Amino acid sequence: MSKVAAVLKVMPDSPDIDLDGLEADLSESLPDGAEINGTDTEEVAFGLTALLTTVIVPDDSGGTEAVEDAFGAVDDVESVSVEEVGRL
């Protein structure tokens, strides 16, 4: 079974959000079969920092939609967008 790597940009709803705590919450929200392979940050504007989270999901699981939905349901997340996708 092949896997897909995707970089998801997670925007917190405030610049005051603890990014380490948010990263832990994202990790806990992952659907079965998905795993976080790394996280980086990106300064956006006005003190707001986005998390760039690399997620590995099985290719047969319908892509990144389940992960996007799970991340979007986490408290303090304003939005989730797919930045990059590629097969492993």
From Swiss-Prot:
Function: Promotes the exchange of GDP for GTP in EF-1-alpha/GDP, thus allowing the regeneration of EF-1-alpha/GTP that could then be used to form the ternary complex EF-1-alpha/GTP/AAtRNA.
Keywords: Elongation factor, Protein biosynthesis
Family: Belongs to the EF-1-beta/EF-1-delta family.
Annotated transmembrane regions: none
NCBIfam families linked: aEF-1_beta, PRK00435.1
UniProt xrefs under PANTHER family: ELONGATION FACTOR 1-BETA (PTHR39647:SF1)
Protein name from the UniProt record: Elongation factor 1-beta
Pfam family, one: EF1_GNE
Lineage of origin: Archaea, Methanobacteriati, Methanobacteriota, Stenosarchaea group, Halobacteria
Alphabetized GO MF terms: translation elongation factor activity
Domain of life: Archaea
Keyword Signal found: no
Coiled coil: none
